[in-house]
Amino acid sequence: VKYIDELTEFFSYNAILSSSELAQERGSYKTFSGSLWDKGQLPIDTYNKLLDFRKKSGSKPEGGKLDWSEVRESISKYGIRNSNIMAIAPTATIGYINGVEQSIEPNFSVLFVYENKSGNFYITNEQFVEDMKKEGLWSPRFAEAVKEADGDVTLLDISEKYKEKYKTAFDRDMFKLIECNAARQKWIDQGISFNLYNKNTSLKYLNDIYMAAWEAGLKTTYYLRNRGASKVEKSTKKEYTEEEQIACSIANPEACEACQ
C-alpha cells in the first residue's frame, strides 16, 4: 500500500503540474473560474474532506512524500488547462492483447474465457505456461487439469511457490485491495475502474466489501466478478454416445430430426 501511495502521488503531482504549465501557455479551461481547482482544492484535499464528513478520520492519509507547494502556487498563478486530469480505465481488451492483466487488477486467472462483441476467447497467462514448461509440467494432460480447475492454481499439483505467485484475484484479500485503491483514489481527481471479486455466497460479505469501498472514499467500483462467469469449457471435443453417433450419421438421415 505504501508503494502504491507514493507511486500514485508521483503521477498525480506531475500530471497536475503539467496541466498548470499548459495553462500558462494556452490558458485555463473555460469554466475554471469558481471550480475546485480555482479554489485551491486538489484531489487530496477533497478526499480528506470526504473522510471528515463521513467521520472516518482514523483512515485519513497523513499527507504525502512530495512538497505540493509548487503545484499549488502554479495553479494559483496560471490556473489549470484540463478540467479532468486523471482516471484509471478498465483496459481489459488491450491488456489481454498485450499479455498483461487489465488496469490495476491482480491476476484474474491463469486460464479463463473472455467475452466481448467479437466472440469468446481463451485467455492464458503466458508467464504461467512458461514457468510450467521450465518445470517440465506443461503437457496436454496438464492443460486439461488447468481447465478442470477453472484456472485456479490452488487446485493444481504444483509447488507452493507457484501457487503463491499465480494466486488469483478471487483468493486475494478484498479489503486489502480496497485499501490499495483508496491509496490511489486520494491522488486521483476522477474514478478508478476497480473490480470486486467474490467466491463466497454470503450477502453479508458482499455488503461488507461494498461498504468498505464506500467508507474508504472510492468514487466507483466496476464489475462484481463471480467464479461461475469465468469457467472454461472442460473439453475442446464433445464425446458422443454410440446412439448419438448412429443418429447423427449421414448414412442414417431418417434417425435425425435435423436431417429431415
Which positions does each model-derived feature cover?
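Extended, well-ordered alpha-helical scaffold/bundle regions in very large, multi-domain proteins
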Residues: V1-T46
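Short secondary-structure transition/capping segments
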Residues: F11, Y240-E243
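Catalytic alpha/beta core of large soluble enzyme barrels
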Residues: Q24, S28, P61-K65, S74-Y240
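Acidic, glycine/proline-rich low-complexity segments that act as flexible tails and inter-domain linkers
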Residues: D38, N198, E244-C248
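Polar, glycine-rich mid-to-C-terminal structural blocks
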Residues: N48-K55
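Active-site Gly/Thr loop motif
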Residues: K55-S69
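Short acidic, low-complexity intrinsically disordered linear motifs used
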Residues: E244-Q260
